[in-house]
Swiss-Prot record:
Region (Disordered): 56-78, 108-135, 177-200
Protein name from the UniProt record: Lateral signaling target 1 protein
Gene Ontology BP terms: regulation of gene expression
Reported function: Plays a role in germline stem cell maintenance, perhaps acting in concert with mRNA-binding factor fbf-2. May regulate fbf-2 by modulating RNA-binding and perhaps by competition with the intramolecular interaction between the fbf-2 RNA-binding domain and C-terminal tail.
Length: 328
């Protein structure tokens, strides 16, 4: 962008050297970080100092025409000049979407205040999720250095705005399938109560009740996606059939594992609902998920699983009780 400046004759300023002008420029020129987009500026121009106004307008990169008539010059005191923003040194500003405009970008008066008057910017939109706050200029705009620390903890806190419905399973997963799916292993077919269609013939599968009633060694199926969220919830069990109770490995004592109190109470209530009088020992049954995370870093805390049991209703609990009460 090329601009031509026509310098008017200055009064009583011929003796100023170029170094003095450069020094006054460095005093009046704002640093690049403070150059903001100002839509309208009302300058206060003293009538007896027209040269000072020309220096300030020349420093800001704005060409304004000054007339010699005193009426027009006095009218400049109340006139609003719509200034044109000129990029210096070919600096490029990132374009900000219109829906994410924030008061901190056009704040000509109170940019020294600690907090801005506007609401905080939207961190998550339904379309883009966390990517809407990818730029640091968008995330921490309008904040001083003392406010950044609290804002970072507020944004990065994983307990903020966590929707538990993302852990919900589809309704079809609560019901036992008529035909075993690919995620159901052959060892697990015995646990399906109801009619199953195998080899073209319909027969009733009677579950084999081993001495270890509840299955252990929870196995995860392949990662599935439901409604856009990654679903890591368990789908199959590997039944641990042992003929000798002495041959079974001695489980670790519960005191050496991380235990969630809510999960343990929910597990005791579940065992009472399925007519099992005493809860099973640690590391047996669903309670071996109480280590909270598995080797791949996936959440295995049973708190979410028991919350799904409450939402699913009594149908799944009845099926679990029916699978135990069927005679061999």
């Amino acid at each position: 962008m090329c601009s031509t400046f026509i310098l008017p004759p200055r009064r009583n300023n011929c003796n100023k050297s170029s170094s003095t002008i450069a020094y006054s420029k460095s005093q009046h020129e704002a640093p690049k970080q403070l150059l903001q987009l100002r839509s309208e500026i009302k300058p206060l121009i003293p009538l007896n100092q027209p040269s000072n106004f020309w220096e300030s307008s020349q420093d800001s990169g704005v060409l304004s025409s000054l007339s010699s008539s005193p009426q027009q010059r006095s009218g400049l005191r109340s006139q609003k000049l719509h200034l044109t923003y000129i990029e210096k040194n070919k600096r490029v500003r990132a374009m900000i979407p219109q829906q994410q405009h924030y008061h901190a970008f056009d704040r000509p008066t109170h940019y020294n205040s600690r907090k801005t008057s506007g609401p905080p910017p939207l961190m998550r939109t339904p379309s883009s999720g966390f990517s809407s706050a990818s730029s640091s200029e968008n995330m921490f705009s309008g904040l001083t250095l003392s406010d950044n620390e609290n804002k970072i903890h507020e944004i990065m806190d994983p307990s903020v705005d966590v929707d538990l419905d993302m852990f919900l399973l589809p309704d079809c997963r609560y019901k036992q399938p008529v035909q075993p799916s690919t995620s159901t292993s052959r060892n697990n077919v015995s646990q399906i109560s109801g009619s199953s269609r195998l080899n073209g013939s319909t027969r009733h599968v009677a579950p084999i009740v081993p001495k270890v009633a509840m299955p252990s060694e929870l196995s995860y199926a392949n990662v599935k996606r439901s409604s856009g969220y990654v679903d890591y919830m368990p789908t199959t069990y590997n039944s641990n059939v042992t003929s000798n109770s002495s041959a079974a490995s001695v489980p670790m004592s519960p005191g050496t594992w991380v235990r969630c109190h809510y999960c343990w109470e929910s597990y005791v209530k579940l065992c009472q609902r399925v007519a099992n009088l005493e809860p099973l020992i640690s590391c047996d049954g669903p309670w071996n998920w109480h280590t909270l995370y598995d080797m791949q870093g996936r959440v295995t805390c049973p708190r979410l699983w028991f919350a799904q049991l409450d939402r699913a209703g009594s149908e799944m609990v009845e099926q679990m009780g029916h699978a135990r009460n069927v005679p061999v």
